[in-house]
Amino acid sequence: MDGMGEGPDGMGFDMPMLMNQQPHLFGGYSRDSSRGSPLNNVLSNPTYNEEPGMAGEDNNDAKRRRIARACDMCRKKKIKCDGKMPKCSHCINYRTDCVFTQVEKKRNPPKGAKYIEGLENRLGRMESLLRLSGLLSEDDGKTDLGTLEKRLADRSLGNTALNSLKSPTNKFNGSSATSQSQHTTASRHSTPRMDSHSSPHTAATSPNSPKESETEVEGLSDMMCSLVTNNCGETRYIGSSSGFSIFSPKGIQWVNEKTGDTSFQEMISSAYVDDNKWMYWKPEIFSDIFARRVFKPLPPKEEALSLFRDFFENFNCMFPLFHEPTFMHLVERQYSRDPYEGSGWWASINVVLAIAHRLRVMSNLVPQEEDKKAWLYLKNAMGVLTELTMRNTDLLSVQALLGMSLFLQGTPNPQPSFFLVAAAIRLSHSIGLHKRGSGFGLNPVEVEQRKRVFWIAYLLDKDICLRSGRPPVQDDDDMNVELPSEDPPDNIGNVPLSDGKGKFNLFRTLCRFATIESKVYKRLYSAKASKQSDGELLNTIGELDRELEEWKDSIPIDFRPEHEIKASHTPLILHVVVLHFSYYNCLTTIHRMSVHHGYWTSRLSNYAIQGLNARPLNPRVFLSAVLCVTAARASINLIKYIPHGDFACVWLILYYPVSALVTLFANILQNPNDARARSDVKLMNVVVNFLSTLVSDESNGSIKRMLGLCGEFERIAQVVLDKAEKESHSKKKRKAAPDEPQDLRQKTPDENSVPSPSTKRPTGAPPTATLFPSSSYPINLGNTGPDMSNPTRAFAPGQTVLGTNGVPTSMQESMHTMSGMGHDFPEMLSPNNMDSVGFGDQQPFGTPTETPMTSFQQPFVPQDLWQMPMTIEWDWADMSSNFPVFEGTPNTGP
């Protein structure tokens, strides 16, 4: 009968009544036995009941515990022990002592522990995907599988009800109608009921389209906002959170419905017609401040029209700051007997004249002295700056502030641009540029121009934010204005392709790029981002890198970064060059965080390689150091597109090549044995020569100081390379010496020993060596791959490997060799080619104890150098006392 329940019985019939019987474990103990130890069945042996008095003795429990294990002699002879007391039968026969040795059996982990751990990891990844798809809410731990199953059932039930309503001929069977009638009736008249802690309605949780509900909510929010315009054309925006939102269209409509007349609406309209606000506010105090000073009169009409034509054809076509028909209408009025007297218009027309003069100087159409006229027109605009910020609330004032900011970006001091952009964005909030404004009653031309002006302010704000490390003014969570039109009727922003068959909207592309810059700062460098865990930050770096690469791939090949620029028009080339510079800077800023935290040397690399992360990891995060250095090289190569001379446009992009020089300088000090170190020094020299061409007069002290600093960087890098080359030759000589004593060979740095802190440095080492520790560390000849047992040593950014000729090379050099990078920058940065970069041949190295940083915290660029400010006007007095200055001489000996 033992086989019953496991198959057919003797007559060939299945026995289903026994299939669900609980299996008998460990020898088939009876269900009727007493609760407790499973040995109770064995202890009911009548042998123990034959001995008198055994049941009542105090040592009865101890004797029973000993029977669970045979005596030592029976175990040694591997015979069955009957457990009799005081001696078992075999011990009596052999006349030996009957000894029971108590041995505690260690419990091993269950065999399925690893399997369960794998299931948990897979389940975690599934939950992460479900959260991304909207099936799970973000409340961790509150949504279990039962709740999820209920939601799916409700959704399925709702879909069934909708299908039944669509097909009236569909009828239920009699058997199913009784079991599903209640659910079907409820589904036909209401949407599926959600729990109180359920996620918001999405495509996965509600049969209704989420876009419709989102549109309704946004439309209601727009209706609760108000944009009031007075008789002067000035507007005033009031948001929905304000206590005065009752003056919004929705609020006025509500009052009209409750009162039954329009008296409230008429009173509000008449009140705003007489709105003067600042016009006569404290005239005895601010009259002299608001007085308009003219530093240079406007040019004659013909000359002005020529300048305006240059502005709209060469500048406004890419940066649509003004609507040309509206602007030219005001120009005609300006040169009539009834000019428009608004301060916003006065500042705007002078800003356009200033930018037009500067464009002519940049194109070598006029002498350099013409730039003085540009500054005089700018002074005219700056003369009404107080009135623009304290008094005006019109679109022309925002445009004038942005125009002044764009002009002053071509100066050594970026502080005015910071202030002007911030003022422009705050003023744009006053007139509601950051909102869609569907209920403002504006015509399509006005709506499009408002979008363009806002996005110019937005991209300037985000560019300043990323380069200076200062928080942005515009909050991305409190704006819903769409991107500019991709193909507008006036063709603004469109650039023809080289084949003549297509076009590309450069302005819209720059606006999309600004949104990525905003995410980079917010998710990597803001105060909130610093609270992320290492794993979250690593995933964020991969996501931002992927989004940046998708943006780059959307650009036509003629203007795409990492490719030659195919444009002949000088102003257009400058716009594309700025686009390329910005891309490389953003790429470096993303991966700088990975390099600084040493993610590719941490345990997270092993964690990701084993597939334990919940989301697929971008493999480029383990190439962050290579990407930063390669982007720096590409940035310096863009200098050839910049006009030579002391032009204002140079200040727009001077940050990028100087920042790239600092990156190459730090990489050379960290990896002096890099195969491209010599070529990197030549690139540093290109930057130095570029700066030297800008020193045109004695008054340009900013360029001179920058030139001196960059020249010192180049000299130190050259000294470090010469020193590393001499040390490499001396190492090879010591290796080649056959008669060298064994004890001396063990002291050479070519073995896998870690030098002690008391080891002396070479006398010729530069003083900066302590700040930038070199990574030409000894090679571990005993290993052939990364030491995964110590993941903090694997994948070090400055890792030394054994080259093909036996000379130690850096990890970056090995990556260049394996990927066939060379000058093929596009292939290097392509995500599809990441598989060609292998880590299997890398040799981990020992970190010297004399370095102040561990391998986990050892970026190839020190953190202080990453924080180089955007402004050139540094406090040079403080820098001269704090910045390390090289004073040593290289060691001429081996």
Curated annotation (Swiss-Prot):
Question: For this protein, what is any one GO molecular function term?
Answer: DNA-binding transcription factor activity, RNA polymerase II-specific
Q: Which GO terms describe its biological process?
A: DNA-templated transcription; positive regulation of metabolic process
Keyword entries, A-Z:
DNA-binding, Membrane, Metal-binding, Nucleus, Transcription, Transcription regulation, Transmembrane, Transmembrane helix, Virulence, Zinc
Annotated region Disordered: the residues are 159-219, 724-797
Kindly report the protein's main subcellular placement as a broad class. nucleus
Specify the protein's topology with respect to the membrane: Single-pass membrane protein
Residues annotated as transmembrane:
649-669
- Can the keyword Hydrolase be found in this entry's annotation? no
Q: What does this protein do?
A: Transcription factor that regulates expression of the genes related to resistance to azole compounds.
Do you know which PANTHER family this protein is assigned to? Answer: ABC-TRANSPORTER-REGULATING TRANSCRIPTION FACTOR (PTHR46910:SF25), TRANSCRIPTION FACTOR PDR1 (PTHR46910)
Protein name per the record: ABC-transporter-regulating transcription factor
Q: Which organism is it from?
A: Aspergillus oryzae (strain ATCC 42149 / RIB 40) (Yellow koji mold)
